[in-house]
């Protein structure tokens, strides 16, 4: 029985494919669901990479169940962000809503995809309430338990 329990989470992760990220909701958005599919960005060489050798991905989001942004506070739009795993760099990918959309390109080695309610759809700096988030496949082996945010210490 113990072996079966260990296999189930791995099977659940693989069901989405190696380049799909299941986005997790928050207590403030219990009905929100989403996936982010990472698709290699266009390149004449077949695979797009940065000068440092990091893969470049276009992010395609499929979202449902997001409430109106105003239900979370003084917000008017949802914006998708690509975020480094240390939470120091937030790169705006674009405005999103329920449905499917390709929002932008991310080229971090390990990263998070975050959908947040923001005061404006053109927001260039994250300041709003997080509605959905997920970790890139390259970040699955990293633990965030040691990050100050999760230990109750301000970064």
Identify what each model region corresponds to.
Residues 5, 13-155:
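N-terminal targeting/export leaders
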